[in-house]
Amino acid sequence: MQGLVRAILRDLCLLNPDKPVIVAVSGGPDSLCLLDVLHKNSYPLIVAHLNHGLRSEAESDAWAVRREAEKRSLHFVLGEDDVATFAADNALSIEEAARIKRYQFLFTQAEKFDAQAVAVGHTADDQVETVLMHLLRGSGLSGLKGMPIRALPNSWSRDIPLVRPLMSVWRTEILNYCREHDLKPVIDQSNLNTTIYRNRLRHELIPNLESYNPSVKQVLYRTTQILAGEFDVLERVVDQAWESVLLDQGKSFVALDAAILERQPVGVRRQLLRRAIAVLRPELRDIDYESIERGLAFLAEPSQTNQIDLVAGLRLMLEGDRLWLATWAAELPSSWPQMAGQDSLRLGVPGDILLPAGWRLRASKVAEM
């Protein structure tokens, strides 16, 4: 296992042995194994741990991680957050809120310490569980290819990669490593709670699938590798199409050439719309199939108001051959008159009215022929 991870660190994670790495350590087997392997490969490490404020054992977990850092003479940073309040305020599940807060903390530390990467302890088992979750939610190729070993750009940074050195290692190998090297991970009892969706997959669905095929996890893992390669091919096609279809872009809007977009194969159209959404909502995961198909249907047959509410507070609007994806509050470039679809104005005939950005709408009677 150590030889495999060493090669991944060098060849796939592309880590420099001389620059700091933020290593996320919860204290569980996966992250403790990651810490130990990185340390034994002499990477300069900063051990980062976030107390989510959710479990009574949280403080003792933080102390356990601190001791592991001190044992190796490594710098330790501790963050604390109120995940439950954040989840309630943003209508998120506790699991999703914890994930967001954890990565925000990790990448804040990475910027603070000028780290070359953030390393997390995702394993091959995590990959299988993630892909199953995406499959059951109706994800496309981008979801079924799973998590990359090195992600740059990612939802948290365009400059600092997120790396997963243990992605090719199975959980059984992790547990064996911990035993062989006398590592004492903390045990998070919430991982046994099957009311949590991922835990239910891990403890109920996957064992059930293994009764049909004992190697189902290995099969699913290989499938992610195949799909990741095919996705790379598709991405190159989409990169070229993006250059021709993108007309304008700002912090709160993306403008696409509707005519060129419609001429693309449907698979490329889907990916172009996904990319436009990702530009404005980089943190958004698992863009659902229905939203993408609704966007493409709107492109083919616009609604009466020429705009629809698409996803995550974004609207899609068609203006001539220009397809806008924008936040509802976006101020669009004034090459065309802008008027929210739900507004109405009274226009006398003859008469004129002023529109935003200096535009004037004028009506006149045409003499009958």
Q: Where are each of the predicted segments found?
A:
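A broad structural signal for alpha-helix termini and local helix breaks/kinks
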Residues: F113, N213, I277-R281
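AMP-forming adenylation/ATP pyrophosphatase catalytic core
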Residues: Q2-D30, I46, L50-H52, D81-V83, ...
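Core alpha/beta nucleotide-donor-binding catalytic domains of modification enzymes
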Residues: M1-E210, R236
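Inter-helical turn/loop segments and adjacent helix faces that build the functional surface
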Residues: N208-V219
